[in-house]
Amino acid sequence: MAEMNLTLVTEFLLIAFTEYPEWALPLFLLFLFMYLITVLGNLEMIILILMDHQLHAPMYFLLSHLAFMDVCYSSITVPQMLAVLLEHGAALSYTRCAAQFFLFTFFGSIDCYLLALMAYDRYLAVCQPLLYVTILTQQARLSLVAGAYVAGLISALVRTVSAFTLSFCGTSEIDFIFCDLPPLLKLTCGESYTQEVLIIMFAIFVIPASMVVILVSYLFIIVAIMGIPAGSQAKTFSTCTSHLTAVSLFFGTLIFMYLRGNSDQSSEKNRVVSVLYTEVIPMLNPLIYSLRNKEVKEALRKILNRAKLS
């Protein structure tokens, strides 16, 4: 019977928020507005970094890639979410669901690795300032980012193959805003031990491994800051606050979503958290890095002054 059901599954039906039809239009307009702010804010960050020579430092090189990933990350999920709200549900073919799942994992994994690299960048800037420029040369930066992209590709391939070799039976309805692992696991049946082990290995390799790099980097940073005069401690640590804020928001939602047991999974909670990491956090990142960064604010001021003069 499971095999028959498996052969009949040719599409999935996304039904998130369909139980609240009166909220469909307000949520559609809200999420559309947030998506536009996300795209414009992150593209503005990328343009600022490309145009201002003061922002050609390693940290901003990594930040430009993070901004690009945030645009891609949101663009994979938000248009689908808007379609679900507008049409009160949306059908997604098996292949399209797998493709969305792969791209979401790809961009999300790269986000994790980039945040880890940015923590390493802050470690070098604070703990090894004399060697900072010589270690993070242009070639080194390109190699690190290329490594993040390759690791993201491998992670996405492993996770997607593991998830979509599972047997799906029963209902094909997904009470979620896009094709993601927690709701898909609720549709599985039959033997899935090997795939679940691979999925767990992915979660350990991407999320906790990135967090270990971040935590170790900041441990060394804190130790280094404790060794400098009290008057300079706040100024030195302020260079890390933007990154720490972004890390706390991003990894906090990922841990809640992916590192809990299946018994703790709630459709409503998962939907709220998914909106946080697909819409809210990518929208806030440009604000976090610009409002708390003097160099970015100065670059923005220069461009605005040029626009006024022209």
UniProtKB/Swiss-Prot annotation:
Residues 47-54, 121-139, 218-236, 292-310 are cytoplasmic. Disulfide bonds join 97-189. Keywords: Cell membrane, Disulfide bond, G-protein coupled receptor, Glycoprotein, Membrane, Olfaction, Receptor, Sensory transduction, Transducer, Transmembrane, Transmembrane helix. GO terms for cellular component: plasma membrane. GO terms for molecular function: G protein-coupled receptor activity; odorant binding; olfactory receptor activity. Residues 1-25, 76-99, 161-197, 258-270 are extracellular. It is a multi-pass membrane protein. The keyword Transmembrane applies. Pfam families: 7tm_4. The chain crosses the membrane at residues 26-46, 55-75, 100-120, 140-160, 198-217, 237-257, 271-291. The keyword Nucleotide-binding does not apply. Glycans are attached at residue 5. One of its GO terms (biological process) is sensory perception of smell. It is found in: Cell membrane. Belongs to the G-protein coupled receptor 1 family. Odorant receptor. This is Olfactory receptor 9Q1. It comes from Homo sapiens (Human). The gene is OR9Q1.
